[in-house]
Amino acid sequence: NEAPSYGGFEGQIGFLMATGGMLCLMPDYLGLGSSDDVLHPYIHAESEAESGIALLQAVEILSDELGISMNGQHFVSGYSQGGHASMALARRMQEDPDAGFPLAGAAPMSGPYDMSGTQVPIGMTLESYANPAYLPYLILAWQQTYGNLFVDLGEVFQEPYASALPGYFDGETSGWYIDNFLDGPTSDLVQPEALESMMMPGHPFHDAALDNNVYDWVPESPMRLFYCTEDEQVFYENALVAEAWMN
């Protein structure tokens, strides 16, 4: 119920951005808001991009019905996971010109653009993570998407977490509640050497991380990357990797 369509704080950001004369689109992620019958495919570049294109197509139809004129300029931005999603969408808009939505500019902010080389590896080196719920969220979401990360969640998490975690990601339990449940050193949550094994080249989890890197392309339209050096959730090195590749 914190999705933009519910009119909360993030929805108000959309209204603020629209005051500059922009037509602002703020989609609910799949699995959030009213689409609560599926686990949100967290940090999944393909579905993020496809959802963005589908929303643009829907708004194009609606604008015709309402008689709203648009000038054909499309700008993309987002923060944190939204930074990842906006980067995925910007890449799709550039690489698929037949979709009909040319990219005028993008401003991804503090996104985990380099999942395989930065976000996951740095997170694995920390004694504890600022928001520990993100780790099972990522693993469960990628398991739903790819289907081959593990046979049993107990391969990754120790008890009682392995048995309890799937029930917590029900669309009703808040992130802070899951964070409190997982509060403690990462070594107390996961099986010994499980994360290191999953990040070995050739492991399905590592392959999924590679599949969801969104930095390895060169924008043909203006892009500005924003990041926070004290970000405890999405490490700022993601932006530095993206900048180095794109330049």
What are these regions (language model features)?
Residues 218, 232-240:
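Conserved alpha/beta-hydrolase "acid-adjacent" motif
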Residues 109-216:
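Accessory cap/linker subdomain of secreted extracellular hydrolases
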Residues 57-129:
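Primarily recognizes the serine-hydrolase "nucleophile elbow" in alpha/beta-hydrolase
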Residues 243-247:
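Catalytic histidine neighborhood in serine/cysteine hydrolases
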Residues 42-65:
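Alpha/beta-hydrolase active-site loop
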